[in-house]
Amino acid sequence: VQGLADALAMMDIPFHSDEAKKVNKLIFETMYHASLEMSMEVAKEKGAYSTFQGSPASQGILQFDMWNVEPTNRYDWNQLKQDIKEHGIRNSLLLAPMPTASTSQILGNNECFEPIISNIYVRRVLSGEYMVINDYLIKDLMSINMWNDNIKNKLIANDGSIQNIQEIPNIYK
């Protein structure tokens, strides 16, 4: 999983907002459903994982049931549970969110599922160091004709923080 902060920035949704939490839940619900569905389809062909019988999933109990989280009604969870009870799932473990630093840099998005750590920072890799800058902030500031050398220098002087740069409107803070 990578680029959650990018997706939220592209939708102009603040990372720590209630709306961001809803989007995050929908994304992970979709990933969980798709992984269960595909694992069940593979189990139809190759059989369930060796210790499936007796597992919570074999009884129609999925992760959200164990955490008392109510899924949305976007998917037919009851049907999927029945299919899983009938056919099993091929994988005992389905999703493993982990850091994705190198590939995220290659693909040009924020690593993992975390917020953007700073608007400007130095990234150190085996081949050297390079500056990483929040392109979404630059785009926003350019849209209001505020991206210039003065703002760039203040951003650097403030270690990537815009909180104390008076010229930048609060909506971007």
Please give the residue ranges for each predicted region:
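Long, C-terminal-biased catalytic regions of enzyme "large/alpha" subunits
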Residues: V1-K173
